[in-house]
Amino acid sequence: MLVLGIETTCDETAAAVIERQADGSGRILSNIVRSQIAEHAPFGGVVPEIAARAHVEMLDVLVDRAMREAGVDFAQLDGIAAAAGPGLIGGVIVGLTTAKAIALVHDTPLIAVNHLEAHALTPRLTVPLAFPYCLFLASGGHTQIVAVLGVGEYVRIGTTVDDALGEAFDKVAKMLDLPYPGGPQVERAAREGDPTRFDFPRPMLGRKDANFSLSGLKTAVRNEASRLMPLELQDIADLCASFQAAVLDSIADRIRSGLRLFREQFGTPRALVAAGGVAANVAIRNALQEIAADDEITMIVPPPQLCTDNGAMIAWAGAERLALGLTDTMEAAPRARWKLDATTETPTKFINTRARH
């Protein structure tokens, strides 16, 4: 099964072709990503209109390149998958409309993919992984602990009550005048800092639920930075290191609660899986490895290039759904908001409904 995947939900324009084998394994034939960092850097963050225009300018070129690198033509494709949300609506429209046009011209099934579901299923592209597993999804817009029970079967165990993890990293970077994109800059500065200099709060520690809260931690960083003004380079490094240390402690506690709740409801997970752009953070990856080792379960984190937004994850999610007979009509709508667990409710615009519930 050959599937073209298109990703345009934020500030990466991406296209990829994957092959799904009969045994359920996958192979990436091409995976082209074009970042928009240069376009958004002058503004210190993603500007939705600029992002949408960049997608329009680049997507056709990237699709053509992905097809050429994969060595296939459109007639060979079994499906066209596009991220239909959640995300910046202008970009989502660009990608989904392009996918619809290709699917219509070549009479190929369309799969409108939930971007979060694509992150959730990516580990199955990289390693043989059976359901169920516990997912820690951390990105610029989402921080969740999810029970992944099957394709289209998701139960949210914990979520952030305020800022997403990636959002908190970006906001801390901005208040410290670090370049865009902020998350990697905070991680880089933290390597040179003292994580014990500032005793920042560890929100939600010890609670029985698995929810996250990061706004108080972010405020504590802002207050300390304001007190120290003007900031020296070592101050910035120490603030970043202390912030990241607090985040790691919070993540560890929240995930341990999530694993306990997972076991109570669904039994022992096959693995603890991390996905989303924040999962590319080395310190966070190492902390997750320690949690999994303590809990005596397998830890799976996709390669960094598959943690951040990319077309291969969209193509793979499309292939997983296509294998169950799940396709969409041309009326599939772009969505700015689309909860992952809402994917368990098969939309009426699916052609058939063989997903397991």
From Swiss-Prot:
Q: Look up the domain of life of the source.
A: Bacteria
Which residues participate in substrate binding? L137, A138, S139, G140, G141, D170, G183, N281
State how the cofactor is bound: Binds 1 Fe(2+) ion per subunit.
Q: Where in the cell is it found?
A: Cytoplasm
Annotated residues that bind Fe cation are located at: H115, H119, D309
Give, as one word, the top-level EC class: transferase
What Enzyme Commission number does this protein have? 2.3.1.234
Q: Does the keyword GTP-binding apply?
A: no
For this record, an example GO cellular component is: cytoplasm
Instruction: Give the family this protein belongs to, as stated in its UniProt record.
Output: Belongs to the KAE1 / TsaD family.
Q: Which NCBIfam families match?
A: gcp_kae1, T6A_TsaD_YgjD
Q: What does this protein do?
A: Required for the formation of a threonylcarbamoyl group on adenosine at position 37 (t(6)A37) in tRNAs that read codons beginning with adenine. Is involved in the transfer of the threonylcarbamoyl moiety of threonylcarbamoyl-AMP (TC-AMP) to the N6 group of A37, together with TsaE and TsaB. TsaD likely plays a direct catalytic role in this reaction.
Q: Which HAMAP family match?
A: TsaD (MF_01445)
Name by which UniProt lists this protein: tRNA N6-adenosine threonylcarbamoyltransferase
The protein's organism comes out as Afipia carboxidovorans (strain ATCC 49405 / DSM 1227 / KCTC 32145 / OM5)
Upper lineage is: Bacteria, Pseudomonadati, Pseudomonadota, Alphaproteobacteria, Hyphomicrobiales
